[in-house]
């Protein structure tokens, strides 16, 4: 840092005032954020999208809803047969699924989801054969969500090397050597 006499600042802040305004990490150690340790004053100036995206596409939501409906169906079938249900092992649920026998069960299987039934009570499924829960609203409706083009998964791939014919390569080398 270049030291200047106080008189040369003429209207500008003194060096002591400038040093007080500079950021010192020792002063902000108690106010660090949980994520990567940035001070809060830096995060307040710029609030970008989070590093992870909490957006779930409708196709993925439908797949998970169908999976949960199948799991609930398996639990109901296991209770009906008198077998104990092991909720801790998800792989056992995936391996032992049965086809629905009634059309109403098929309809319910596609419409029920984890958000609709927070507990594993199977008695709520068969309260009414026409029971169709409303689809859950996406969390992104509340805040400005990503557009369909903004958050696409892009897999990195090494670009293909361009192969020039040997004659063109030699001609380009000769042009560069003549200059």
From Swiss-Prot:
- Residue stretches of biased makeup (Low complexity): 1-15
Q: Pfam families per the record? A: CDRT4
Give positions of region: Disordered: 1-20
Q: What is this protein called?
A: CMT1A duplicated region transcript 4 protein homolog
Q: List the top taxonomic levels of the source.
A: Eukaryota, Metazoa, Chordata, Craniata, Vertebrata
């Amino acid at each position: 840092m270049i030291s200047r006499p106080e008189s040369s600042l003429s209207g500008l802040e003194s060096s002591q005032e400038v040093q007080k305004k500079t950021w010192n990490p020792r002063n902000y150690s108690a106010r660090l954020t949980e994520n990567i340790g940035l001070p809060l004053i830096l995060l307040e100036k710029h609030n970008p999208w989070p590093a992870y995206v909490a957006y779930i596409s409708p196709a993925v939501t439908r797949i998970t809803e169908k999976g949960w409906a199948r799991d609930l169906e398996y639990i109901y079938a296991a209770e009906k047969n008198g077998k104990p249900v092991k909720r801790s092992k998800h792989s056992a649920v995936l391996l032992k699924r049965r086809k629905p026998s009634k059309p109403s069960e098929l309809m319910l299987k596609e419409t029920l989801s984890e958000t609709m039934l927070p507990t594993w009570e199977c008695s709520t499924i068969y309260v009414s054969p026409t029971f169709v829960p409303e689809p859950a609203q996406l969390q992104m409706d509340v805040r400005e969500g990503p557009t369909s083009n903004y958050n696409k998964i892009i897999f990195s791939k090494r670009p293909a090397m361009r192969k020039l014919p040997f004659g063109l390569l030699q001609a380009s080398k000769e042009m560069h050597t003549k200059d």
